[in-house]
Amino acid sequence: MIRNRDRLLGSDEREPTRSLALDCVEAGIRAADPYRVVSEAVEVRDGVLTVAGESYDLGDYEEVVVLGGGKAAVGTAAALEAALGDRIDRGAVVTDDPESRSDADAPALDRVTVRAGDHPVPSQRGVAATRRVLDLADAADESTLVLAVVTGGASALLPAPAGDLSLADLQATTEALLASGATIGDLNAVRKHCSALKGGRLAERTSPATVVGLAVSDVVGDDLGTVASGPLSPDDSTFADARRVLARYDVDPPAAIRDRLDRGARGEVSETPTAGDPAFERVSVHVVASATTALDAVAEVARERGFDPLLVSSRIRGEAREAAKTHAAIAEEMPDTGQPVDPPAVVLSGGETTVTVRGDGDGGPNLEFALAWALDIDADPDADLALASVDTDGEDGGTGVAGALVGPETVVEAGAAPAGKRRLSAETARDALADSDSLGALADADSAIRTGPTGTNVNDLRVLVVGETSGSE
């Protein structure tokens, strides 16, 4: 899975530690493979479909339709086809990599069409692909069973401009909010009120069909109103909330966006549906994979190798460079005091950090987390430590790399000149952070992790390996 593994590993005594960090990353991503997890959650026996414990008699429906999208859409749809075969009448899903097959056993799709969109900024081809999804939703009636694919990344991959809004309006607003460091909840509050699909609108479009959603969660806490901007879930945000988000992050949107939000706040545009709305009476959504899925697999690998696993949290959030300081402090504390766990140990965390763009470089939350950790860590450069921080979809912040593998030797202070690969001066690291160019610095140090699209998305995964010989300066 990690394409540049050999370049990431050195020939010194730390190679086993670095190798374990990469093994843990791979195990976490593979555990969240949508084909695998959906195959375990879905079963068809004697004409009855069971999804995560809920049963549906296929004889009660005249048509079975698959629709939706996201980074994990292909694997999810493939598992549904493997289970139901020709019981699926038609379908369409949208993803950023239509050829993605993270699980070698996942079959090519036959009943469901895969269409391409773009992430993290929506595109025209995404709009065209989403129209097909909405056509299927609009055609559903009370005799239809809709199997809805709701996975991380669908907020951008399924753009459906509401009312008179244009794609350009959505693009400009999305780019500005991403650059501002807005949280996913705040970003989605705006998205939901500018979309004909998000914030429960897809549930409205499919009603009165029976809808079974399968969600691969990429959000902290697995809030179904946030995953993919909650197309099948009640929305408790309002047009007024969306306006406050823009003000909070000092984002000046296109006039059409501002006009729509203003009219909505005045009650001239209908709000997104809330809990108790009839649109949700025949809708159920099941989370089949999340950050916990990946973290559990990492912990198992650690135990197998004789390292005690310690989960910090599956809900780490906030500025990436600030969150990195806590992980640096833990790495320093463990060898000195045995707290919060005695080495050798693997400290792991998930969640979703953000980056407030300060310059014109290239980077993402996991790259910035890794670079900030390497700059902040107060440990001997020869300490037996390694940190891998990746986005499980294989693309951190739209950079084309998954994240980075770093150690206490990655950044050296003045007077200890960089020598060999995997070395950066502290000045270079600080300049890169100031210019939001964590990728540039880490790529030069041969520290960027390259996986390509993984076909899943359960957000950030961080693995800190602390060996027995680690020690602070």
What is the predicted function of each stretch?
Residues T292, D296, E300, E304-D384:
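Active-site segments that bind and position negatively charged phosphate/pyrophosphate groups
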Residues V94-E142, R191:
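Glycine-rich oxoanion-binding loops at beta->alpha junctions
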Residues L178, G185, A189-V251, G440, ...:
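A glycine/threonine-rich phosphate-anchoring loop and its flanking beta-alpha core
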Residues M1-L67, G75-T76, A82-A83, V312:
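An N-terminal, well-structured beta->alpha segment
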Residues E81-R87, A106-T113, P161-A172, S207, ...:
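A glycine- and small-aliphatic-rich helix-loop capping segment at beta-alpha/alpha-beta transitions
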Residues L165-T183, D235-V251, G359-L387:
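Gly/Ser/Thr-rich active-site loops/lids in small-molecule metabolic enzymes
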Residues G363, A370-E473:
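Internal helix-turn-beta structural module
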Residues D235-A324:
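Accessory alpha-helical/coil subdomains and C-terminal extensions
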